[in-house]
Amino acid sequence: MPGGMMADLEAFRKAQRADGPATILAIGTATPPNAVDQSTYPDYYFKITNSEHMTELKEKFRRMCDKSGIKKRYMYLTEEILNENPSVCAYMAPSLDARQDMVVVEVPRLGKEAAAKAIKEWGQPKSKITHVIFCTTSGVDMPGADYQMTKLLGLRPSVKRVMMYQQGCFAGGTVLRVAKDLAENNRGARVLVVCSEITAVTFRGPSDTHLDSMVGQALFGDGARALIVGADPVPEVEKPCFEMLWTAQTILPDSDGAIDGHLREVGLTFHLLKDVPGLISKNIEKSLVEAFQQFGISDWNQLFWIAHPGGPAILDQVEAKLNLDPKKLRATRQVLSEYGNMSSACVHFILDEMRKSSQQNGCSTTGEGLDVGVLFGFGPGLTVETVVLKSVPLQ
């Protein structure tokens, strides 16, 4: 190839890349209207699943709910919907068709609601969105939820779409990692990132032989969160709330089968080992060292924290292992308390909670007054996603 053409190609490639790091420009949220009080949920759950005769199991489930750290959750499944779909209420009854009929409609609809709010906050015309990343663990369909939401929002047909199915609870970090690469390698790109999760795929009646399923029934909630990600924000027009500096993904050693899920005739079943909190807490410091040694940080209390709230035991053990100030996981525990575990969407709810509380409390940055922070996603594998974030000064 002639030297002049090589030089032109190099200049072309360089011109395609952004100058600065990817930033989060807006965040939008959506939940189903049906709010569930955790304190009364055991009575409701055992009644709606025709399991009130299982009194000992009900008391065990009540203890799970009491220890969950959750006050309320939001669920698409109302009493009326469940009464119309008794197969969903049974334990391991063939019910995939009924579940799919719900989620293939509701997942993109809820995602669209969150996306519309993010676009409104961003303040730019939706025609400027160049890429869409849609993530859900709730059902599978073709064309996917990415396509359905694109149509619902009225985005350009040429928008470049990425669909992620069946990633689970670590995927709130995954979508940020992919969005960062897209934004930084495509000058002017504006990436709409949506995580939408509906527990209609996992809801089922109790069983004393499958207690890990009951743990999920005590923890999981529904919600969608959307973000606009882009590099080189337009001054005075776009207002970033966080920058993304570095990302990683790893599979923890000796963790095969620690968390897994399987889509079957009965819906999505999931299994988790008791030692999931131990596996995460034992290995998390290695991920922190890998992420922050390049920034000269080794005191984990210098960071602001956004950790997927898989459950209170994970948070407690991470806190103890790293000697974290209890305030570090305040935003994480707050979201767990108000929404439950919403799988991939959770960490984005925590990002929103942190920036809003930082503003309300008069902090100097969106990261509770700190400059650098970490976002962790934990999920099937056992897989850990790590995102290093930089906060933005608050005026």
From Swiss-Prot:
Alphabetical UniProt keywords: Acyltransferase, Flavonoid biosynthesis, Transferase
InterPro entries (UniProt xref): Chalcone/stilbene_synt_C, Chalcone/stilbene_synt_N, Chalcone/stilbene_synthase_AS, Polyketide_synthase_type-III, Thiolase-like
Domain of life, source organism: Eukaryota
E.C. no: 2.3.1.74
UniProt catalytic activity: (E)-4-coumaroyl-CoA + 3 malonyl-CoA + 3 H(+) = 2',4,4',6'-tetrahydroxychalcone + 3 CO2 + 4 CoA
Pathway annotation: Secondary metabolite biosynthesis; flavonoid biosynthesis
Enzyme class of the recorded protein, top EC level: transferase
Biological process annotations from GO: flavonoid biosynthetic process; polyketide biosynthetic process
Gene3D superfamilies: 3.40.47.10
Active-site residues, as the UniProt record annotates them: C169
One Gene Ontology term of the molecular function aspect: naringenin-chalcone synthase activity
Pfam families per record: Chal_sti_synt_C, Chal_sti_synt_N
Family: Belongs to the thiolase-like superfamily. Chalcone/stilbene synthases family.
Role: The primary product of this enzyme is 4,2',4',6'-tetrahydroxychalcone (also termed naringenin-chalcone or chalcone) which can under specific conditions spontaneously isomerize into naringenin.
Protein name according to UniProt: Chalcone synthase
Annotated organism of origin: Pinus strobus (Eastern white pine)
